Amino acid sequence: MANSKFEYVKQFEQPDSLLPNTWIVVRLDGRGFTKFSTKYAFEKPNDKRALDLMNAAARSVMSELPDITIAYGVSDEYSFVFHKSCTLFERRASKLVSTIVSTFTAYYIHHWPTYFVDGPPLSPPLPSFDGRAVCYPSVQNLRDYMSWRQVDCHINNLYNTTFWALINQGGMDGTAAELMLKGTFSADKNEILFKKFGINYNNEPEMFKKGSVVFRNYELVEPGTKKVSEEEAEEMSSSAVPEVKSKSQVEKDKKVRTKAKIVVEHLDIIRDEFWERRPWLLSGTPGKVPKEP
């Protein structure tokens, strides 16, 4: 910016760099998606096209931003995780959130015709998302956050599956279905599904029950193999002085990440096994790219 008498306005800008040496999670949510899903006749309780579209947009975001370690999505929300050592945009919250949200929204609209082939084209108001950034100081905090989202997915999906079965197959209206489910537990909902409608909840698609996890796929580590453990990752990433990699190492890691395939899986991310078999998610160091068959 050229020097001028107007340059003083820069003094009003507020620094918004996020805490150093903490995991950054940028979570986005659809704005007004209840009306949006009605407008485009999303299937209830789950529309596979809509979920596949969300996953495609998330993959595209991760492809454009190698700094993202892992992402998790369910319904109209997605969480993107940056490693503690991330220095992208000098860790400025406004830059990170706006980049994630705008890139995701752009790809959501871009991929729409691929997944909603027979439906009407998008028209205003167009789909949009809001976002926020939260810092988590430890690996356990991060894992608890991810577990919270997946548990929330299960609870909501079981309720919605039962609720819409009562409406679509049981002939109830929304008020009656809601009243019937009031105060019920998971076992009660499973019993309603099975006894009334012959639905075994365990046979529902994994994506509906567990959500979607997106990450770069490297060679899996066998349980018990000596790699970077969670405790070691915790110790390395929680030191008072954040690790600073050389420029050459940063470039090397970036090249490895671009070679890795970005996958969408529907796995249990609460259990230790998921993380133990993919130590690169916590260590911040890329794994070994699988050989092509």
From Swiss-Prot:
Query: Is rRNA processing tagged as a keyword?
Result: no
The record's EC number reads 2.7.7.79
Region span, Disordered: 226-252
Regarding protein family, the annotation reads: Belongs to the tRNA(His) guanylyltransferase family.
Specify which residues bind Mg(2+) 2 according to the UniProt entry for this protein: D29, D76
Q: Which InterPro entries match?
A: Thg1_C_dom, tRNAHis_GuaTrfase_cat, tRNAHis_GuaTrfase_Thg1, tRNAHis_GuaTrfase_Thg1_sf
Sorted keywords for this record are: GTP-binding, Magnesium, Metal-binding, Nucleotide-binding, Nucleotidyltransferase, Transferase, tRNA processing
Molecular functions (GO terms): GTP binding; identical protein binding; magnesium ion binding; tRNA guanylyltransferase activity
Positions annotated to bind Mg(2+) 1: D29, G30, D76
Name of a matching Pfam family: Thg1
Source organism of the structure: Neurospora crassa (strain ATCC 24698 / 74-OR23-1A / CBS 708.71 / DSM 1257 / FGSC 987)
The cofactor binding remark recorded in the entry reads: Binds 2 magnesium ions per subunit.
**Segments crossing the lipid bilayer:** none
Q: Which GO terms describe its biological process?
A: tRNA modification; tRNA processing
Q: Which cofactor does it need?
A: Mg(2+)
The main enzyme category here is transferase
Name of the featured protein: tRNA(His) guanylyltransferase
| Encoding gene, per UniProt annotation | rgt-1
Sites binding GTP sit at D29, G30, R31, G32, F33, T34, S75, D76
Q: Which reaction does it catalyse?
A: a 5'-end ribonucleotide-tRNA(His) + GTP + ATP + H2O = a 5'-end phospho-guanosine-ribonucleotide-tRNA(His) + AMP + 2 diphosphate + H(+)
Entry function: Adds a GMP to the 5'-end of tRNA(His) after transcription and RNase P cleavage.
